[in-house]
């Protein structure tokens, strides 16, 4: 069964497909109220909190962010303002300075522990492409290390091996991993 997860996110702003886009392509409904959140969490052990439903002011900012097409301060604030106020966080950061900033911010929040990751290839997640930074955060303490997926038995791949696309392309790739039809880099990246 494992840990329950509450992901807080949005549609794509600076890429072709965001978390909400992927879930919609998979025909997974977005929870839009606290009752649905609790029901999904109880039944599935996971729920996605679509930011505009839970932070109404974000609806007014979304068109501006979309038109800019680049990362903004909201790429930092969004993950840190999860309405579920979890005790444990796992967050990806798009740059090394942002990973450090997020880790330092979380160390001053009411949390038990957090992990902030940044792929040294510039991605906001660890991948089989190469090494990644890991910030292990506890209240008033941040520990930084660099990890290599090879140390965990995961072989290398190229960025092209993990190249995504729009929500439909990405949802097909995810389904293939879940159905064990893809035993390559996508599966390794998901691990």
Please identify what each model-predicted range represents.
Residues 1-40:
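A generic, well-ordered mixed alpha/beta core segment in the N-terminal half of proteins
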């Amino acid at each position: 069964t494992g840990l329950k997860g509450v992901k807080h996110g949005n549609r794509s702003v600076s890429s072709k497909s965001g978390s909400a886009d992927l879930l919609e392509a998979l025909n997974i409904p977005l929870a839009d109220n606290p009752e649905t959140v609790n029901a999904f969490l109880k039944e599935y052990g996971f729920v996605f909190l679509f930011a505009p439903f839970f932070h109404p002011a974000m609806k007014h900012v979304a068109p501006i962010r979309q038109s800019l097409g680049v990362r903004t301060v909201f790429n930092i604030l969004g993950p840190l303002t999860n309405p579920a106020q979890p005790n444990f966080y796992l967050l990806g950061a798009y740059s090394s300075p942002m990973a450090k900033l997020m880790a330092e911010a979380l160390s001053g929040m009411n949390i038990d522990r957090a992990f902030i990751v940044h792929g040294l290839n510039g991605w906001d997640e660890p991948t089989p492409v190469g090494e990644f930074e890991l910030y292990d955060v506890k209240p008033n303490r941040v520990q930084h290390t660099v990890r290599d997926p090879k140390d965990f038995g995961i072989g290398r791949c190229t960025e092209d091996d993990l190249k995504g696309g729009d929500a439909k392309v990405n949802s097909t790739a995810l389904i293939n991993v879940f159905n064990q039809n893809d035993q390559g880099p996508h599966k390794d990246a998901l691990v």
